[in-house]
Amino acid sequence: MDKFRVQGRTRLSGEVAISGAKNAALPILFAALLAEEPVELQNVPKLKDIDTTIKLLNQLGTKIERNGSVFVDASGVNEFCAPYDLVKTMRASIWALGPLVARFGRGQVSLPGGCAIGARPVDLHITGLEQLGAEIKLEEGYVKASVDGRLKGAHIVMDKVSVGATVTIMSAATLATGTTVIENAAREPEIVDTANFLNTLGAKITGAGSDRITIEGVERLGGGVYRVLPDRIETGTFLIAAAVSGGKVMCRDTRPDTLDAVLAKLREAGADIEVGEDWISLDMHGKRPKAVTIRTAPHPGFPTDMQAQFSLLNLVAEGTGVITETIFENRFMHVPELIRMGAHAEIESNTVICHGVEQLSGAQVMATDLRASASLVIAGCIADGVTVVDRIYHIDRGYERIEDKLRALGANIERVKGE
């Protein structure tokens, strides 16, 4: 397995171009199964999870070419089963189910794998599709969905806010007869992006970005060209890299309006921040950040995917900061690794109390999930000595060429190929 070897005590400064959002590109790629004509997707990041999705769509009979843009032609889909060998590495595969049953009347997906953070049940996807008229069976480790004729619009009140299930229901409802209303829908920017993509193909979706989404079913979806929105979590990660190192960074090709909660907390931590239409600059003027208190929440609250990075900020900040994780259980696995580097923290159920220290020390640490691993790499950049981060395949699932981008900011980082 590959590792990162990072030589520390670096102040990270410079410019970074932000890639397309993984969490928008994935649902959009699966939603392209609904289209009867070719689709061109621009700004799709080059990531492990994207490669897995392309393989999976290929197995279903979709023709895909990657040549700058990703070209998807789902007119020849002739397989309706997403097999275990691909699904096991990535939970997002469940997003194949809604489009398959909506367009072809049947689909089956192996129960999924992916990051090791807590229970992310598929039951909300299943109940949503059942309310649209699909018959669902769980057999031999597969979720099997079928419907006679077309799905039927329904008024769906979601038990809890779920990005994944909102995508499944919204995508499937585009080809249902009648109108579907989703109440208590997720409001994330990636939901809005998926809805905008589907509307480009001829869907009739309104209200995305609010907690009430309305979908008027249409007979078919055509083709189109769509540009995936920039990755707000990658943006936030590079802003943190500058903030914890006393540095200065300019993030280009990004969307400041998707990062309100994160920018507010960075300002509270003492960062000098300016924004334009598609850029954000952060300058710490060489100062240490101040500790902040954070509680993760569904959008527009503070994103759980930035929690690990802000844990690092608090652990090297002036003062004591408290972080409460309300979205996923078991999402503090990076904290014991940072303690190995000299951080002072206590975990109490879903809360971590961070006592800032002036300097971390290099150590051997292990990545446990995608966002945790990014915080460990950045910790290595500012620690005294050498840090080796193991199991970095987690990082490759969600960050495009993170080592190249960090190097451009002055980091001393190399990828060590594993056996």
UniProtKB/Swiss-Prot annotation:
UniProt entry keywords in alphabetical sequence: Cell cycle, Cell division, Cell shape, Cell wall biogenesis/degradation, Cytoplasm, Peptidoglycan synthesis, Pyruvate, Transferase
Active-site residue numbers: C115 (proton donor)
GO-annotated molecular function: UDP-N-acetylglucosamine 1-carboxyvinyltransferase activity
HAMAP family cross-referenced by the UniProt entry: MurA
Presence of the UniProt keyword Heme in the record: no
GO biological process: cell division; cell wall organization; peptidoglycan biosynthetic process; regulation of cell shape; UDP-N-acetylgalactosamine biosynthetic process
Family that this chain belongs to: Belongs to the EPSP synthase family. MurA subfamily.
Protein name: UDP-N-acetylglucosamine 1-carboxyvinyltransferase
Organism: Serratia proteamaculans (strain 568)
Function text: Cell wall formation. Adds enolpyruvyl to UDP-N-acetylglucosamine.
NCBIfam families, alphabetized: murA, PRK09369.1
